[in-house]
C-alpha cells in the first residue's frame, strides 16, 4: 500500500516540476514576446489596415479601399522614380560590395605583415559615425574643391567644365551614393567572409595543389564553393538593406538633385512626416516595399536550394 501511494504521488510531483519549469521558461520569453507584439506586430497590423485608408493624424480615418495602391502605380511619378532608383541602387551595391569584401577577405586571410592593422582599417568606415564618414566623403567628392576632381583636372587633363559634379549632378549622384555605400559596408562583410574562410578545409587545397592546380583554380573550384552559405547570407543581407536604404541618401544627396536619388524609404519618410502627413498613403508604399523584398528573398532562397 505504501509503495502504491508513493507511485501515485510521484507523477504529481513530476507534473508540478514540469509546470514550474515551463512557467520559468515562459517568464524569460515573455518580455521579448511582449516587446515584439507592442513594437512590431501591432504596428505592422495597423500599417496593413491603414494602407487601405486616408489619414493625416488629425481627422478621422477614412476607408478608401485600393485607391492608394492605384495612385501609386498610375499617377505617382515620384514613387515610380523612387522604386526605379531603389532597384538601381540594389543592383549596383550588391555585386560590388560582394566582390570587394570577398577580395579583401581573401587577401587579408593570407599571412601578410600588418594583417590585423589592415583588417581594422578596412572595418573603420563601417563602425565610424555615418555623419562623420559622409562629411569626409562629401569633402573628397566636392565638385569644385574636392581632391578627386583636382586629380582628374591636373593629372588626367579633364577640363574644369567637364569635371563630374558627383553628388550634385543628376547623372552621377546615384553613382556617388553607390560608391559611398560600397566603401562603407565592405569592411563589415569582409569580416563575415573571413569567418567563412576560417571554416574552409585546407586539406582540399593541399590535395589540389599536389594535383597541379594553381591558386586561381583552387579558389574557384574549392574555396568559393565552400563559401556558398556565407555568400548566400551576404547577398540576402545586402539585398534587404539595399531596399531599405535611407541614411546614405539623407546624408549625401537628400534624395536629389530632383528625384535622382530618391528611394522608396526616403519617399515614405517624406510622405509621412514632411509637409502634410499622409499616413495611409505612406503605409501603402510600405506594403508594396514589403511585398517586393519578400518576393526577392523567396526567389533567392529557392535559387540557393536549386544550386545546393
Predicted stretch roles:
Residues 1-10:
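Short, intrinsically disordered terminal tails adjacent to the first/last structured region
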Residues 9, 18-308:
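A structural signal for multi-pass alpha-helical bundles of membrane permease subunits
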Amino acid at each position: 500500500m505504501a509503495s502504491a501511494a508513493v507511485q501515485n504521488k510521484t507523477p504529481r510531483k513530476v507534473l508540478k516540476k514540469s509546470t514550474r519549469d515551463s512557467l520559468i521558461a515562459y517568464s524569460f520569453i515573455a518580455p521579448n514576446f511582449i516587446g515584439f507584439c507592442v513594437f512590431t506586430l501591432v504596428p505592422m497590423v495597423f500599417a496593413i489596415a491603414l494602407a487601405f485608408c486616408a489619414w493625416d493624424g488629425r481627422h478621422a480615418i477614412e476607408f478608401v479601399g485600393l485607391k492608394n495602391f492605384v495612385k501609386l502605380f498610375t499617377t505617382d511619378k515620384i514613387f515610380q522614380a523612387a522604386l526605379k532608383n531603389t532597384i538601381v541602387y540594389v543592383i549596383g551595391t550588391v555585386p560590388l560590395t560582394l566582390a570587394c569584401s570577398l577580395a579583401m577577405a581573401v587577401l587579408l586571410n593570407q599571412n601578410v605583415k600588418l594583417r590585423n592593422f589592415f583588417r581594422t582599417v578596412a572595418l573603420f568606415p563601417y563602425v565610424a559615425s555615418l555623419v562623420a564618414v559622409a562629411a569626409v566623403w562629401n569633402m573628397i567628392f566636392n565638385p569644385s574643391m574636392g581632391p578627386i576632381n583636382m586629380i582628374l583636372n591636373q593629372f588626367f587633363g579633364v577640363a574644369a567644365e567637364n569635371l563630374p559634379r558627383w553628388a550634385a549632378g543628376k547623372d552621377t549622384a546615384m553613382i556617388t551614393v553607390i560608391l559611398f555605400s560600397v566603401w562603407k559596408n565592405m569592411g563589415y562583410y569582409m569580416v563575415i567572409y573571413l569567418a567563412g574562410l576560417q571554416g574552409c578545409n585546407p586539406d582540399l587545397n593541399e590535395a589540389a595543389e599536389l594535383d597541379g592546380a594553381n591558386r586561381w583554380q583552387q579558389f574557384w573550384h574549392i574555396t568559393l564553393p565552400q563559401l556558398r552559405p556565407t555568400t548566400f547570407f551576404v547577398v540576402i543581407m545586402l539585398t534587404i538593406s539595399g531596399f531599405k536604404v535611407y541614411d546614405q541618401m539623407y546624408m549625401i544627396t537628400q534624395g536629389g538633385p530632383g528625384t535622382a536619388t530618391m528611394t522608396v524609404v526616403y519617399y515614405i519618410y517624406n510622405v509621412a512626416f514632411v509637409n502634410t502627413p499622409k499616413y495611409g498613403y505612406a503605409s501603402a508604399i510600405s506594403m508594396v516595399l514589403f511585398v517586393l523584398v519578400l518576393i526577392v528573398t523567396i526567389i533567392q532562397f529557392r535559387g540557393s536550394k536549386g544550386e545546393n
